[in-house]
Amino acid sequence: MFARIVSRRAATGLFAGASSQCKMADRQVHTPLAKVQRHKYTNNENILVDHVEKVDPEVFDIMKNEKKRQRRGLELIASENFTSKAVMDALGSAMCNKYSEGYPGARYYGGNEFIDQMELLCQKRALEVFGLDPAKWGVNVQPLSGSPANFAVYTAIVGSNGRIMGLDLPDGGHLTHGFFTPARKVSATSEFFQSLPYKVDPTTGLIDYDKLEQNAMLFRPKAIIAGVSCYARHLDYERFRKIATKAGAYLMSDMAHISGLVAAGLIPSPFEYSDVVTTTTHKSLRGPRGALIFYRKGVRSTNAKGVDTLYDLEEKINSAVFPGLQGGPHNHTIAGIAVALRQCLSEDFVQYGEQVLKNAKTLAERMKKHGYALATGGTDNHLLLVDLRPIGVEGARAEHVLDLAHIACNKNTCPGDVSALRPGGIRLGTPALTSRGFQEQDFEKVGDFIHEGVQIAKKYNAEAGKTLKDFKSFTETNEPFKKDVADLAKRVEEFSTKFEIPGNETF
């Protein structure tokens, strides 16, 4: 009895203490944040319905300045594009208000009737654009971007600490294909999966498929990745398929850069030979910033006795995306992707793709005319890699000077580069300017501007210091350099502003 009384008293004291603590916590939660400065919105306006120019002039000015930068400059980053006004309308629609964890017909929230309709429509269009049979292919349209899409695939088909093989980053691959250095595991894909990169032939710059096959038979990866971020030639998907089958691996194709050209039917498609295909939606596909994962359905293989082995990718990949890596999808992005996919089905989109390829070849020839070496000698797609090592200019220095002259590109490693931190070239792409209406004769002029910028970098290279930091400091203070760049920038702006940019007029 005494024990029970003590126990009750102890419990009473415990609850009393807990109650006291809760009251203290409650008081703390409601204590005003003394250091937060708040502003009062004007009485005659509505913060929820007014234009961003009124609600937040500071943000509006930044957006407006970015629009001006895009308009006055030459956008040559191969992974960028200008999406349409219709896609932007979808991104700014009421679809951004809804939470919808799960998949159509199986959501964790109510009120998803039209969200389901939009996601199913997006899936339908994604399959139509690439000519895929819904009985043989499925697609997940929820990945937030390309990197998590690739990670979801590895999670689904490779598993923790499983083995993957992708093209090495310095040779034209992507971070998400398993990149690491001797010093550290740079990408999470090399942290959670075992990665063995394959390489290009340092002489030709072309993928060494024989060496890839040899290493795949030794390494026995669960997935081989046929994908690039800076490789100007077509991939041999049939050869990839044979190697993957021989090694007992899935073939995953990452067509993020080239999916728009595949959609237009202008370059080889990975679908005939792949088990899984991923893509972003904002590069040559010209949509919003999102991603798609396509996966095989039906029969994977048949043994000598006629027994079929079926694909089981649908549930694995969908589960890896949600709930594995993501929560609620971005429904406004899915709406924007659906709009972009409808545009892919137009004749106008095919004409755009054809012009992208013509412009890339024109730019390649113009750069060669100016004496520059190109990795692989040219291009079959939307990009080219200019090797600046023969003229003694690092890619980062060329990128910096071109940026000052309103020409946006990116430094990039070239085959044979010793360090990814000091790349020897610059990558150039044609989709963005093609979307602005640039044609072959315009890209000849673009090539001339690039040449001028690189020559300015070369002219001042020796006196500008040994490090990139020294070089940038020099460009901020040296008056002859600043005069040369200002002259080029003025002519670039005069040329570029003749062309319109899709989207909203001012921001």
UniProtKB/Swiss-Prot annotation:
Top EC class, one word: transferase
Pathway where this protein functions: One-carbon metabolism; tetrahydrofolate interconversion
Signal peptide region: none
InterPro entries: PyrdxlP-dep_Trfase (IPR015424), PyrdxlP-dep_Trfase_major (IPR015421), PyrdxlP-dep_Trfase_small (IPR015422), Ser_HO-MeTrfase (IPR001085), Ser_HO-MeTrfase-like (IPR049943), Ser_HO-MeTrfase_PLP_BS (IPR019798), SHMT-like_dom (IPR039429)
UniProt keywords, alphabetically: One-carbon metabolism, Pyridoxal phosphate, Transferase
A Pfam family: SHMT
Reported effect, G227E: In t1552; causes recessive maternal effect lethal (Mel) phenotype where homozygotes are viable but offspring display an embryonic lethal phenotype
Effect of R107Q: In t1597; causes recessive maternal effect lethal (Mel) phenotype where homozygotes are viable but offspring display an embryonic lethal phenotype
GO terms, biological process: embryo development ending in birth or egg hatching; glycine biosynthetic process from serine; tetrahydrofolate interconversion; tetrahydrofolate metabolic process
Modified-residue entries (N6-(pyridoxal phosphate)lysine), positions: K283
GO CC, any one term: cytoplasm
Effect of G166D: In t1679; causes recessive maternal effect lethal (Mel) phenotype where homozygotes are viable but offspring display an embryonic lethal phenotype
Gene3D superfamilies named in the record: Aspartate Aminotransferase, domain 1, Type I PLP-dependent aspartate aminotransferase-like (Major domain)
GO molecular function terms attached to this record: glycine hydroxymethyltransferase activity; pyridoxal phosphate binding
Consequence recorded when altering A291T: In t1616; causes recessive maternal effect lethal (Mel) phenotype where homozygotes are viable but offspring display an embryonic lethal phenotype
Enzyme Commission identifier(s): 2.1.2.1
Record flagged with keyword Transferase: yes
Phenotype when changing R125K: In t1555; causes recessive maternal effect lethal (Mel) phenotype where homozygotes are viable but offspring display an embryonic lethal phenotype
Cofactor names: pyridoxal 5'-phosphate
Annotated effect of mutating H282Y: In t1607; causes recessive maternal effect lethal (Mel) phenotype where homozygotes are viable but offspring display an embryonic lethal phenotype
Catalytic activities: (6R)-5,10-methylene-5,6,7,8-tetrahydrofolate + glycine + H2O = (6S)-5,6,7,8-tetrahydrofolate + L-serine
Resulting phenotype, S274F: In t1520; causes recessive maternal effect lethal (Mel) phenotype where homozygotes are viable but offspring display an embryonic lethal phenotype
Family, as annotated: Belongs to the SHMT family.
Function: Interconversion of serine and glycine.
Protein name: Serine hydroxymethyltransferase
Originating species: Caenorhabditis elegans
Gene that encodes the chain: mel-32
